[in-house]
Amino acid sequence: MAQLSFNAALKMNALGNKAIHDPTNCRAKSERQMMWVCSRSGRTRVKMSRGSGGPGPVVMMSSSTGTSKVVSETSSTIVDDIPRLSANYHGDLWHHNVIQTLETPFRESSTYQERADELVVKIKDMFNALGDGDISPSAYDTAWVARVATVSSDGSEKPRFPQALNWVLNNQLQDGSWGIESHFSLCDRLLNTVNSVIALSVWKTGHSQVEQGAEFIAENLRLLNEEDELSPDFEIIFPALLQKAKALGINLPYDLPFIKSLSTTREARLTDVSAAADNIPANMLNALEGLEEVIDWNKIMRFQSKDGSFLSSPASTACVLMNTGDEKCFTLLNNLLDKFGGCVPCMYSIDLLERLSLVDNIEHLGIGRHFKQEIKVALDYVYRHWSERGIGWGRDSLVPDLNTTALGLRTLRTHGYDVSSDVLNNFKDENGRFFSSAGQTHVELRSVVNLFRASDLAFPDEGAMDDARKFAEPYLRDALATKISTNTKLYKEIEYVVEYPWHMSIPRLEARSYIDSYDDDYVWQRKTLYRMPSLSNSKCLELAKLDFNIVQSLHQEELKLLTRWWKESGMADINFTRHRVAEVYFSSATFEPEYSATRIAFTKIGCLQVLFDDMADIFATLDELKSFTEGVKRWDTSLLHEIPECMQTCFKVWFKLMEEVNNDVVKVQGRDMLAHIRKPWELYFNCYVQEREWLEAGYIPTFEEYLKTYAISVGLGPCTLQPILLMGELVKDDVVEKVHYPSNMFELVSLSWRLTNDTKTYQAEKARGQQASGIACYMKDNPGATEEDAIKHICRVVDRALKEASFEYFKPSNDIPMGCKSFIFNLRLCVQIFYKFIDGYGIANEEIKDYIRKVYIDPIQV
């Protein structure tokens, strides 16, 4: 009978023992029982290894002969005398008893669900009320509107918008400044306060407010030099405001060195603008009110939007009105004052940005499934205004905005809209750098975050996406290292998106991270700070927390069922395998309550596949593997009398499960699908036999041969077909192969699984005699290539495969149920995260444990 080499056995056991005897690995020690015993003759020492699964057969490895024997724990009777390998994997971190003790009130009480239902209705109302944008008042912009003059009948000037002046008079804070009381940013407060003091001084009113405001400015102006960051275009706008304040006789410390330095910087930038008077840089239009002395007011009118605004900025629009008397500017500002009750925001309209941001916010929080119709309406609206030039904050924005465009590209593509990444080319300067590279402020940082996230969805050969990634990733990593912004929430988001890009971001893990860092009093910054109530929303946060906990309670019940099944089936007693119920369950990456049957079937089948993988790799002989495979092909349990009893038990458990799941499939699909179900299992075990024959012959296949076989033996075929047939959607016979094997998307996801796995397991497999891996096969095809060369090549192949899989996933296919496509496509996530640093299935480490704890074990505080 064919045997693995003695040296391979020793190497494998040496590798396994390293995990057990490593003094730094206390968990591994405590979860393994290792005993040295003597035979009755006193001549042979035997090492006995048992996993954490409990009672069951023990594999005994003789130190003198290298052979192993399966013995009964209770009688120590030798069952066979065949050399076998024993894989000393780390023990199960989520033992049956741990899972069974989980309790949560969110499953038992209807109060939580009733409150969640109420919140869903309220948030739907918020979607339905979306208009041109809901945004907080801006003292800075309102003061600009208050400064606009008109000529009265006696020839004297008076405020054209007295309601704006009254708002400035009545909204000074206790410390003498103007701004959002709950959030202090020095740049924001100074811009708001200086301009408010100017507005009051122009009309010679509010003398006490002017005095208090000037006192605040004088006290804080000296601190400006200590600021780590300045708001966008501060160096253009603020010196111009100080010049106006000085002309009005407002007593301030104008000669501070830092103020002089700001003025010098402004003069240099004005020189650049003057030299390009016929072509003012678009990114400087936002600071138009700081450029008064160099603007040609006739030529500037070509930048006016349909709604009458200039770059959606009331301040800039008021400045143009002051210098031109344009009626469209007047009408817009008058309408804004009516809408916002005597004040104006820092930008308007923001209908596109608000819709995209709300959808993005809802989906980040993990509650998007409650608002499918509302999301579609919002995105249909955005898509109607989508342009190859890009989009701005509002539908009438004349100048596209990188942040809104990148967010739109990502969100629209995610939902299946046809949008080209070439739109990003509009945001590069002559050096190929994106506009957001200028300024180094967190407004630009937000743009780069969305640029990076958009690049996650790259298709093959999309140069614009590749350029975006090359620019955005180092930019964000540098931002994390240098802390160029004080925005804590934004940094937490950057840490997550860089650490877990889209192809690695498990939906529930992302939701947990976003909820934990969510700030329902969050402010954004343009020239000044502002709030968007639809985004910084306590109702969204409350629903997200409740929904997460309610769904988690269902997941806990499913995990209890699954660990109980694993134990009662006897599989927990099999000691040659890894016990990974919680990890396999996590791998489904499908959390919606309606897919409970899918998750349960996937996990049961997946756990058995982990067992089969270990059985084929380290336990079964070639002949036993062939017998087992023949039983699978014939769908017959009577062919198993020549294989060990533990393998017979595994087969019977598998066979029973197949019958049970097929019965469930019949109920959903309305017909017997067994013929479809058997095919991937036959392919799967045939590949195991092929791999073992190559191993026994010492043959390393070519890279192409390797992929054809090993991409199947990774096991996605058998473990996904029945689950997708249980998703509640009818899958026609001819559609099965379009979504499952051998569809392009399925093969690409399988390829990414196989090769990503190889990069973290090949050394361990090589040590136990399994020479064939993607790394080894590439090196065989390319003499002289190093392991490092092979890994780099494999990473490129995986990157390409994921891009092609994305293209296949988003490609329109009306006959394929979207739920089925999503289930297959989302399986790419778990392999990327499980094999990010180590073999996350073979070594049940603390990082994986932390993922599972966050998603399934620990509820969110409500």
From Swiss-Prot:
Organism whose genome encodes this protein: Taxus baccata
Co-factor remark: Binds 3 Mg(2+) ions per subunit.
Which residues make up the binding site for Mg(2+) 3? N757, T761, E765
User: Which sites bind Mg(2+) 2?
Assistant: D613, D617
Q: Name the chain's protein.
A: Taxadiene synthase
Give the record's keywords alphabetically.
Lyase, Magnesium, Metal-binding, Taxol biosynthesis
Q: Known InterPro entries for this protein?
A: Isoprenoid_synthase_dom_sf, Terpene_cyclase-like_1_C, Terpene_cyclase_plant_C1, Terpene_synth_N, Terpene_synth_N_sf, Terpene_synthase-like, Terpene_synthase_metal-bd, Terpenoid_cyclase/PrenylTrfase
A Pfam entry, by short name: Terpene_synth
The EC category is lyase
Question: What are the binding positions for Mg(2+) 1 in this chain?
Answer: D613, D617
Enzyme Commission number(s) from the entry = 4.2.3.17
